[in-house]
Swiss-Prot record:
Recorded name of the encoding gene: kdsA
Family: Belongs to the KdsA family.
UniProt xrefs under InterPro entries: Aldolase_TIM (IPR013785), DAHP1/KDSA (IPR006218), KDO8P_synthase (IPR006269)
UniProt subcellular location: Cytoplasm
Cross-referenced Pfam families: DAHP_synth_1
EC number in record: 2.5.1.55
Protein name: 2-dehydro-3-deoxyphosphooctonate aldolase
Pathway: Carbohydrate biosynthesis; 3-deoxy-D-manno-octulosonate biosynthesis; 3-deoxy-D-manno-octulosonate from D-ribulose 5-phosphate: step 2/3; Bacterial outer membrane biogenesis; lipopolysaccharide biosynthesis
Domain of life: Bacteria
GO cellular component: cytosol
SUPFAM superfamilies: Aldolase (SSF51569)
Principal place of residence: cytoplasm
Lineage, uppermost ranks: Bacteria, Pseudomonadati, Pseudomonadota, Gammaproteobacteria, Legionellales
């Protein structure tokens, strides 16, 4: 299934596209710098790009953790990125978010993994009419996403993506099953792989989550080789000082070489075709 986002189309047989940015809006300056650098890199690579940042991280491990600037200031910053740099924007929303207010600014709405089974929430987000990236819960089998997508489609909005971000594996650990990417294609939605949250160690540091960012390129390459429409990565100029998800954020300075590799892999895989689609 092909889907239009801003001025480009996404789908399994289209070139790989990127969703990337810092986990949370820390400041206008940082957001503008990261978005500008990502736009420059993706323009050089001729890779479609959607900028991602959150104005409110509602599911932090500790109530003392930084959540973001809030919706008013956050949307103002995201709108500036969109207008100044001319890039499409994606941000996540929650059950108490004024959805229409966010939809008036961004190009894609994203639903958090923890909320993928909240039926009213999924329907409300989809009913906005914007493209939606539904992140699969860490507790959900890939085939269960068909029912989540059906709830969204029931609103009449067919512009739905599904995003794989790992599976809970014991306490404070996630693993990635590459078979899930092929299974998720059966939803008939573009499939995205979140390479950074997939290396997260949820709650692994007690008051915050840990992560193994050294494995980001490993999983990103594997997912691209499996066949996906897009790759999702949170990035930061100095991940060790990031205010949210630093341990699993990929360094901004290393984004270009990783994306160059993924672009080449994507081209080879999609030119060869997907034998599993005719394995029977």
């Amino acid at each position: 299934m092909l889907m239009q986002i801003a001025d480009f189309e996404i789908g399994l047989n289209n070139p790989l596209f990127l969703i990337a940015g810092p986990c949370v809006i820390e400041s206008e300056a940082l957001v503008m710098d990261v978005a500008g650098e990502l736009k420059s890199i993706t323009q050089q690579l001729d890779m479609p790009f959607i900028f991602k940042a959150s104005f409110d991280k509602a599911n932090r491990s500790s109530h003392l953790s930084y959540r973001g600037p809030g919706i008013e200031k956050g949307l103002t910053i995201l709108e500036k990125v969109k207008k100044t740099l001319e890039v499409p924007i994606i941000t996540d929303v929650h059950e108490d978010t004024p959805l229409q207010e966010v939809a008036a600014v961004v190009d894609v709405l994203q639903t958090p993994a923890f909320l993928c089974r909240q039926s009213n929430f999924i329907r409300s987000v989809a009913a906005c009419g914007k493209p939606v990236n539904i992140k699969k819960g860490q507790f959900l089998a890939p085939w269960e996403m068909k029912q989540v997508v059906a709830k969204a489609w029931a609103t009449g909005n067919k512009k739905i993506m599904v995003c794989e971000r790992g599976y809970s594996f014991g306490y404070n650990n996630l693993i990635s099953d590459m078979r899930a990417l092929a299974i998720l294609r059966e939803t008939a939605c573009p499939v995205i792989f979140d390479a950074t949250h997939s290396v997260q160690l949820p709650g692994g540091h007690g008051t915050n989550s840990g992560g193994q960012r050294e494995f980001v390129p490993v999983l990103a390459r594997a997912a691209t080789a499996a066949g996906i429409a897009g790759i999702f990565m949170e990035t930061h100029p100095d991940p060790d000082r990031a205010l949210s998800d630093g341990p699993n954020s990929w360094p901004l300075a290393k984004m270009q070489p990783l994306l160059e590799t993924l672009k080449e892999l994507d081209k080879v895989v999609k030119n060869a075709g997907f034998l599993e689609q005719s394995s029977e």
